[in-house]
């Protein structure tokens, strides 16, 4: 399927039919308006991820915030998720899982392993193509600590490929301040992504942002799976048993489950609705 307005898109992104085409790129849109992801299904070299990501994000009609590449698995997964940034993303894992299920004609609830470049083992995704509900089991934090930020002593959770600072407050700082701070933290921790979440305990409401240094991108997702998982893990710390929690964010709610056994986090999952859009093909 081609873009509905190919001449407009080709003109603005310099992808013209008169130009000799070196490749055709197939992708599917996922996520809500304002936080759209492009799931690229064409096999491309990882060396091209950075350039293709920048070019696709520059197409204004797509209104995309992220680009992910769905590739053949390298291990025991059914599909592999890779990005130019290389950071852990619960949202992208859930979107990739549903896209895989739909592409295989799966019409019932099913669990399957999805690989990601930031973790050594596949992560279990539970998808229901009929309802669009998708849950992913994320890896537990590898380490935790504290940090003095924004005039408070904040907790820090280090996941594989991504770290989150957990603060209390009702609003995120201005973008320039966020970018500077998170860029410094990503460099200090030598990680693909550094994030911060602000939790308002009175309203039980959360906002988050993440900076990806490899693509120099600051994201403020309306409903972030990984941030919700970090919030749930922090709330359940040192409390034995099974903890279920609804995490409210500007873009909606996500359901989290944390299992603590013997003082260790044994399971961390986050789920909610995923929206898949049309599939497109672009030539350039």
Where do the protein language model's features map onto the residues?
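Short, Lys/Arg-enriched N-terminal segments with co-localized hydrophobic residues
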Residues: 8-22
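Active-site proximal loop and beta-alpha junction motif in alpha/beta enzyme cores
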Residues: 21-89, 94-223, 228-284
């Amino acid at each position: 399927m081609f873009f509905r307005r190919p001449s407009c898109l080709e003109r603005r992104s310099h992808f013209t039919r008169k130009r000799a085409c070196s490749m055709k790129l197939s992708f599917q849109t996922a996520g809500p308006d304002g936080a759209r992801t492009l799931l690229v299904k064409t096999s491309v070299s990882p060396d091209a991820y950075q350039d293709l990501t920048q070019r696709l994000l520059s197409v204004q009609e797509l209104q995309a915030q992220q680009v992910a590449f769905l590739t053949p698995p390298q291990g025991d997964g059914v599909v592999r998720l890779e990005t130019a940034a290389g950071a852990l993303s619960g949202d992208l894992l859930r979107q990739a899982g549903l896209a895989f299920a739909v592409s295989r004609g799966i019409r019932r609830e099913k669990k399957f392993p999805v690989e990601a470049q930031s973790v050594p083992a596949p992560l279990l995704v539970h998808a229901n193509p009929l309802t669009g509900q998708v849950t992913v089991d994320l890896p537990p934090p590898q380490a935790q600590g504290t940090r003095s930020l924004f005039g408070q002593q904040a907790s820090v959770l280090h996941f594989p490929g991504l770290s989150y600072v957990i603060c209390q407050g009702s609003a995120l700082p201005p973008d320039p301040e966020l970018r500077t701070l998170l860029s410094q933290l990503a460099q200090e921790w030598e990680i693909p992504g550094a994030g911060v979440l602000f939790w308002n305990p009175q309203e039980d409401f959360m906002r988050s942002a993440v900076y990806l240094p490899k693509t120099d991108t600051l994201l403020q997702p309306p409903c972030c799976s990984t941030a919700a998982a970090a919030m749930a893990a922090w709330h359940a710390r040192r409390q034995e048993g099974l903890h279920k929690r609804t995490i409210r964010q500007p873009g909606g709610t996500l359901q989290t489950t944390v299992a603590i056994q013997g003082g260790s986090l044994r399971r961390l999952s986050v789920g909610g609705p995923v929206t898949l859009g049309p599939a497109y093909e672009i030539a350039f």
